[in-house]
A protein has these predicted regions:
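Two-component/phosphorelay signaling modules centered on CheY-like receiver
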Residues: 16-35
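C-terminal output helix
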Residues: 93, 111-124
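Acidic catalytic/metal-coordinating carboxylates
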Residues: 39-42, 66-69
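Short amphipathic alpha-helix used as the core "switch/output" element in two-component signaling
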Residues: 68-79
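Alpha4 helix (beta4-alpha4-beta5 surface) of REC/receiver domains from two-component response regulators
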Residues: 69, 90-107, 111
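Active-site beta3 strand of CheY-like receiver
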Residues: 51-57
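Receiver (REC) domain active-site loop signature in two-component systems and cognate sites
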Residues: 62
Length: 130
């Protein structure tokens, strides 16, 4: 079963170059990047006036509100949103904590871009089955 509308994605990262790079690469693969923010608080503020995306690609270590705290808010107020931690932080430390909080996956920023694409495909397939 195919979704009628393209999956929508948000990118939340305090590094503007990373946001632009990820947006460009995802857009070139046909993904619809609908929101960007430089920290969790800015993203939450934008969610109150915009349609929530299907998937959030979320950095962990950001000023104002980090990815962990953002995840708690997202799962409380937008429980259907899928969350992929996208970070340079140590996976062994943050993966388990992120899953506990409700994140759906973790991709290292220095991993091949195909890993992020594969994670997105996996989450889209899970959503189509549900």
């Amino acid at each position: 079963m195919k979704q009628e509308l393209p999956v929508t994605i948000a990118i939340v990262d305090d590094n503007a170059l990373i946001r632009e790079s990820v947006k460009f690469r995802l857009s070139s693969l046909g993904y619809n990047v609908v929101l960007e923010a430089e920290n969790g608080q800015e993203f939450l503020d934008k969610l109150h006036v915009n349609r929530a995306p299907d998937i959030c690609v979320l950095d962990i270590n950001m000023p104002v509100m980090d990815g962990m705290e953002t995840t708690v808010h997202l799962k409380k107020d937008w429980p259907g949103m899928k969350i992929i931690f996208f970070s340079m932080e140590d996976r062994s430390i943050y993966y388990s904590k992120g899953i506990e909080l409700g994140a759906d996956g973790f991709v290292a920023k220095d991993a091949p871009f195909a890993e992020l694409n594969n994670m997105l495909i996996s989450l889209m397939n899970q959503s189509q089955v549900a």
